[in-house]
Amino acid sequence: MAEQDSNPVFQIQRVYLKDVSLEQPNSPQILLEQSQPQVDISLAVNAETVADGIYEVSVTATVTTKVADKTLFLCEAKQAGIFEIRNLPDGQTQPVLGIACPGIVYPYLRATVADIITRAGFPPVHLAEVNFQAMYEAQQQAAAQQQGAVSNGNGGSPIITNA
């Protein structure tokens, strides 16, 4: 029985849409513009401890589309998942939270963003595939450099915040 309790556990408890918004602050006038819109997309990953061995991982996408420096539309969506992660070898929980969990949540986010933008009457914006391992490694490197420059005593990884 004790052997079962020490086996590694990784389970998806739930994937859900946590937040979504779409704004068209300059409609309807801007819809008459003939200029090609400029699209800016940003992504953020966050992980929080919900309970012992239970984590919420969210991926947020912000799509800002402008025509001649005026916002055509702004879409922001946050897709989240609740994961049970227990008994992983030392040092493995952070990479799972920063790489595997966002990779599970992200396809749902991509579909939501494309759907919301299409329902608003625009051609869909398809978010590109993301290499969450490269993103995680870049965050870790940036955090290490920042800690080297300014020792703030936090320690650990920036990916997890406690609720």
From Swiss-Prot:
SUPFAM superfamilies: SecB-like (SSF54611)
Localization per Swiss-Prot or TrEMBL: Cytoplasm
BP term (GO), one: protein transport
Alphabetized UniProt keyword annotations: Chaperone, Cytoplasm, Protein transport, Translocation, Transport
Transmembrane regions: none
GO molecular function: unfolded protein binding
GO cellular component labels: cytoplasm
InterPro entries xref list: SecB, SecB-like_sf
Main location: cytoplasm
Quaternary assembly: Homotetramer, a dimer of dimers. One homotetramer interacts with 1 SecA dimer.
Functional description taken from the UniProt entry: One of the proteins required for the normal export of preproteins out of the cell cytoplasm. It is a molecular chaperone that binds to a subset of precursor proteins, maintaining them in a translocation-competent state. It also specifically binds to its receptor SecA.
Xref: NCBIfam families: PRK05751.1-5, secB
Protein family per UniProt: Belongs to the SecB family.
Stated name of the protein: Protein-export protein SecB
Gene: secB
